């Protein structure tokens, strides 16, 4: 069995002075191993996974190394790989490692408490392992939830419950420490002299914040201890500046603005590490509060987004979340220059600009900050007065704050395509599609070492190209994913076929004249109708993905229409082009420029074939729903609303005796709640604050449409996020 604190041999026959010296070595060894773990994870965030794993392997072989944090670091690396790709073997490998880290953390926590091992001047013995335990639990539980097994999901909820309970206790201590730090207590330097280890030699006096007590007279002059303490300080300073993994200090690359053509900030020449970070913060203390803020924050946000039925059950046992509190904690974690800050930033990027549209840019309802702040004050003893507090308006639209955080990550990790990709996505979210594409094209995807990031880059670029109606390149990217990613070959193939279908239609309308009409036709037919044969091959789940089920249903619809109309050409059985549906799922209508929207409108209204001319009610519903959104984005909200009210919604529900009754429809399950959601958005756009009660009614209708349906997670979370925002504004 490994010895967490046996770094420097047994205490068997030691004198009190020797015991004190051994204890100090153990404290420093722990801080050293945590710095090694943080460095290894930073290598991964800079697209240098092999270097990070090799560093961990070397550290694991050292006698007396802290195997707990090293195992967790390996688990975090594998978790990042798994959640970027969702591939079977990587999910399994990460789950096994995190399970080990979970067990080791619990044993280390108990050992530290039993031996009263103090490695922090702020937190009780064992706290840092309580954090590694909750982090392991949280990440492990998320992987179990992704498995879509009922048994694994039940186990995951138990893990989350344990993590939640422990994090609540940790957060009490963290908040107490924060209040103490911001009170009229002694300055950090004075406090350091009172509670930290001070070394004195002929040449220097050095205070180590990593030693949470005064040193004995012998240890104060111990050159080996001094050398070890200075080494840890140097490691930490290198990490804070971004120079620890072989890059030059990050502030030399820091920019003020997004985009390929921007240059480093003029202020970067005058920048120093002390401008951003507390240099007198111990490594263990930093890990504790950044890890606690991140994990508890993520838990709060995830719980707040759960469907009402599940949320109600969990709240009965005290398992509930506050989105605002959770977001504030995640934002607080991003202020730290370690892996917790980076994971927090990735989470925020997904929240603000991901496919689930938790913060739909069109639903820009100003928050009722007074109510939420009053509630928060009552919970946190006036935490709104603490430095860095973010009010509700800032949490809803962080704007430049999120942009600056991303630019710092880009400067810290210049070799990583992951952060470049997030910058490109942010540009696209701002409507700067061409700038986004230029940034993506600035890197050779074959130079990306991390295969999972490479596949993400190619897929996101394909989505962007679809929004720009550049379907040739989009199809090429999607087909190339068959050799890169094992996620869903069926969806990649179908999506590429839809791109070729749209190109074929554009040639028929005279909008594209490249002499490849027959090629587009043949490729569209081949890829769309062959895609179902790839289902079940190279997917990470035992069940088909939601978008796989969407694809399978659509192809079956096309086949049924072909038989119904007795058509020779399969492509003539496709009414509304499915590429427009896929664009909706990936927030395309909010990102398209005016010219792109005009072309979308033209393709939805001017193209004709036998399936379209048959005016099938279900296909007309899809076409008119997407057309109404296009009109709204083009500034013609009144016309879009009329289309929705007169043609789309009467096919979805009716009012009987004052109660909403839904038509039982299964042809396109995602579209019906989505139409009700979009009706609420129309209400907001045309009525403003005076229409909030009506908005709420439409969102409740959307939420109550069905308990489960195709793409219910994607659509349902968007609905719940909007409903929470409306109810907050009405409070």
Swiss-Prot record:
Pfam family, one: Iml2-TPR_39
Places the protein is found: Cytoplasm; Nucleus
Positions of the UniProt region annotated as Disordered: 1-26
Record's keyword terms, sorted: Cytoplasm, Nucleus, Phosphoprotein
Top-level lineage group: Eukaryota
Compositional bias segments (type: Polar residues): 10-26
GO biological process, any: cellular response to misfolded protein
Protein's UniProt keywords contain Nucleus: yes
Main location: cytoplasm
GO cellular component: cytoplasm; mitochondrial outer membrane; mitochondrion; nucleus
Residue numbers of Phosphoserine PTMs: 265, 268, 378, 383, 392
Modified positions (Phosphothreonine) in chain numbering: 380
InterPro entries per record: Iml2/TPR_39 (IPR019412)
Keyword Phosphoprotein: yes
More info: Present with 4980 molecules/cell in log phase SD medium.
The family this protein is said to belong to: Belongs to the IML2 family.
Quaternary context: Interacts with lipid droplet proteins PET10 and PDR16.
Function: Inclusion body (IB) resident protein that interacts strongly with lipid droplet (LD) proteins. Involved in LD-mediated IB clearing after protein folding stress, probably by enabling access to the IBs of an LD-stored soluble sterol derivative that acts as a chaperone in inclusion clearing.
Protein name: Inclusion body clearance protein IML2
Organism annotation: Saccharomyces cerevisiae (strain ATCC 204508 / S288c) (Baker's yeast)
């Amino acid at each position: 069995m490994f010895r967490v604190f046996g770094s420097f041999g047994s205490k068997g026959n030691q004198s009190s002075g020797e015991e004190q010296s051994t204890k100090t070595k153990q404290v420093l060894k722990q801080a050293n191993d945590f710095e090694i773990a943080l460095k290894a994870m930073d290598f991964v965030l800079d697209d240098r996974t092999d270097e990070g794993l090799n560093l961990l392997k070397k550290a694991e072989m050292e006698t007396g190394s802290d195997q707990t944090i090293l195992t967790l670091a390996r688990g975090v690396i594998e978790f990042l790989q798994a959640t970027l790709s969702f591939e079977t073997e990587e999910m399994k490998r990460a789950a096994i490692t995190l399970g080990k880290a979970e067990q080791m953390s619990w044993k280390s926590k108990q050992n530290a408490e039993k031996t009263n091992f103090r490695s922090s001047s702020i937190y009780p013995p064992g706290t840092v392992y309580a954090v590694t335990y909750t982090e392991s639990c949280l990440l492990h539980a998320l992987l179990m939830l992704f498995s879509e097994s009922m048994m694994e999901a039940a186990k995951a909820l138990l893990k989350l419950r344990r993590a939640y309970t422990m994090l609540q206790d940790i957060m009490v201590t963290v908040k107490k420490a924060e209040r103490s730090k911001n009170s009229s207590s002694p300055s950090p330097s004075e406090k350091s002299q009172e509670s930290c280890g001070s070394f004195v030699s002929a040449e220097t006096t050095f205070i180590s914040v990593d030693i949470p007590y005064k040193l004995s007279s012998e240890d104060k002059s111990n050159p080996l201890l001094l050398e070890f303490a200075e080494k840890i300080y140097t490691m930490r300073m290198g990490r804070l500046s971004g120079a620890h993994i072989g890059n030059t200090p990050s502030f030399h690359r820091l920019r003020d603005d997004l985009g390929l053509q921007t240059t480093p900030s003029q202020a970067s020449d005058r920048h120093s590490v002390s401008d951003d970070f507390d240099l007198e913060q111990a490594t263990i203390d930093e890990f504790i509060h950044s890890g606690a803020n991140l994990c508890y924050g993520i838990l709060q946000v995830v719980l707040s987004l759960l469907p009402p039925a599940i949320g109600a059950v969990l709240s009965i046992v005290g398992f509930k979340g506050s989105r605002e509190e959770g977001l504030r904690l995640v934002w607080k974690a991003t202020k730290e220059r370690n892996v917790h800050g980076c994971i927090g930033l990735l989470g925020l990027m997904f929240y603000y600009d991901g496919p689930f549209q938790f913060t739909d840019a069109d639903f820009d309802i100003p928050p009722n900050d007074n109510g939420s702040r009053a509630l928060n004050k009552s919970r946190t003893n006036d935490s709104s007065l603490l430095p860095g507090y973010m009010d509700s308006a800032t949490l809803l639209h962080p704007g430049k704050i999120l942009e600056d955080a991303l630019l710092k990550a880009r400067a810290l990790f210049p070799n990583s395509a992951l952060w470049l990709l997030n910058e490109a996505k942010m540009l696209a979210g701002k409507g700067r599609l061409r700038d986004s594409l230029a940034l993506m094209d600035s890197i050779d995807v074959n130079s990306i070492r991390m295969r999972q990031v490479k596949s993400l880059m190619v897929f996101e670029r394909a989505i962007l190209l679809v929004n720009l109606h550049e379907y040739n390149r989009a199809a090429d990217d999607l087909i190339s994913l068959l050799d890169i990613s094992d996620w869903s070959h069926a969806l990649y193939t179908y999506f590429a076929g839809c791109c070729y279908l749209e190109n074929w239609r554009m040639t028929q309308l005279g909008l594209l004249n490249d002499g490849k009409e027959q090629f587009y036709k043949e490729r569209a037919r081949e890829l769309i109708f062959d895609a179902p044969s790839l289902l079940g091959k190279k997917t990470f789940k035992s069940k088909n993905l939601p978008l796989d089920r969407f694809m399978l249903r659509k192809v079956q619809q096309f086949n049924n229409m072909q038989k119904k109309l007795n058509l020779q050409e399969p492509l003539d059985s496709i009414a509304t082009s499915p590429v427009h549906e896929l664009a909706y799922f990936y927030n395309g209508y909010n990102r398209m420029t005016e010219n792109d929207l005009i072309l979308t409108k033209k393709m939805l209204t001017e193209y004709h074939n036998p399936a379209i001319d048959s005016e099938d009610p279900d296909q007309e519903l899809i076409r008119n729903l997407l057309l109404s959104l296009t009109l709204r984005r083009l500034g013609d909200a009144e016309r879009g609303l009329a289309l929705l009210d007169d043609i789309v919604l009467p096919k979805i529900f009716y009012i009987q005796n004052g109660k909403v009754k839904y038509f039982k429809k299964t042809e396109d399950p995602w579209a019906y709640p989505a139409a009700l959601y979009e009706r609420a958005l129309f209400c907001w756009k045309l009525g403003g604050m005076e229409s909030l009660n009506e908005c709420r009614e439409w969102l409740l209708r959307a939420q109550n449409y069905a308990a489960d349906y195709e793409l219910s997670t994607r659509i349902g979370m968007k609905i719940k996020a909007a409903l929470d925002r409306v109810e907050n504004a009405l409070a």
